[in-house]
Amino acid sequence: MDQENQDDSGTGDLAELRKEIDKLDLRLVDLLNERARVVVRVGAAKQVDGTPVYAPDRESAVLKRICELNGGPLPNRTLQAIYREMMSGSFALERPLQIGYLGPQGSFSHLAAQRKFGSSVEYRPLADIRAVFDEVARCHCDMGMVPIENSSGGGVIDTLDGFLETHVHMCGEVVLEIHHNLLANCTAEEIKAVASKPEVFAQCRQWLATSLPNIEQTPVASSSRAAEMAAQQKGLAAIGSDLAAELYGLKVIFENIEDNSNNMTRFLVIARQPAKRTGNDKTAVMFSTAHRVGALVDVLNVFSRHGINLTNIDSRPSRRRNWEYFFFVDAEGHFEDPNFAEALAEARHHCGELHVLGSFPRATEPI
C-alpha cells in the first residue's frame, strides 16, 4: 500500500512538472514568433538599405551576449546551438540563403556548414573546392564553406589556390572536431573492404592496423563517396561522419576510430562582402615579396613592430612567374583597426603585391 502511494505520488509530481514544462513551452513559442515578426521587419529594413542577410559581426555579438546572460544549467555551447538554429530560421524569413560546400552530401564540409548555418538554409554540394569559390564569385551561392587546415594534415592547397584565382572575402571561420566512424550496411565480421579518402586512412592508420589488419583499403575521392558506395555494396565499409551515416542509411559499426582524439579541421566561410569589426577578429593577408634578400623577413618584422600576433603562415607558387611565391598570413585583429591599417600600409613597401583576403570573428572553440 505504501509502495502504491509512493508510486502515485511520484507520478503526480512528474505530471505536475510536465504541465509546468508545457506552460513554459507555450510562452517560448509565443516569444519565438514575436521575435520572428521583428526579424521580418529587420529583413525589410535590410532590403531598403541593401544590407546583406548574413552579418557575421551581428551573429558574433548575439552569441557573445547570450553566453554572458547565461546563468545555467544549460551550457553555453547548447545555447549557442539553439540560437544558431533560430538565426537559420531568421535567414529563411528574410531571404533563403544558399551555401555552397565541398560535396557530396555528408562530407565534413557539409557538417561544418550545417553546424554554422542550421537547417533552414539551402545547401549546394559542389564537385571541388574551386567550384565553391567560383559559385560564390558568380553570385550563384551567397556563401561557401571550404576547409583551410587540419591539425594532423596541415594546410589545404586547393583552398589557398582559390584565393589566388578568385575575388572573394573570408567572413568567418569554423573549427570542427573530426571524428571518424566505420560505417556499413553489414556486421563487422562481414566487412571485406573499407573505402575512404587517403587522408582519412592516414588519420586512422593505427586503428585500422589493429582492428582490421587484413581488410583491403579502397581509396576514393571523398568520405561521402565512400559512404554512398558502402550503402550500395554489402561487405564494403566506409570511414565517414555521423551525418554521412544518417544520409546514406548506414549503421555506425565503430565510433571515433581516428588515432588522434584531438583531430580538428578549420573551415572558412567565404562571401562577396567583408565582415565588420567585432573586437575579437582575425585577418588573412596574401602577399608576394620583392626580389631581394630578406624581403620576407622585412614584411614579418612590420607586424612584429606593431605588436600584431601572426597565428599562421603558408605559401603557394604564384602561377604567374616561375619561382615567385605568394605568402598567406593569419593575424589577430581587424584590417580596419588603426594599428593594423598602419602595419598594412608599411608592409606594402616591402611587397610586390598585398591583398587583404578578409577579417572575421575568431572561432574561440569548436562548433
Language-model region placement:
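Domain-level signature for soluble enzymes in the chorismate/prephenate branch of the shikimate pathway
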Residues: 1-367
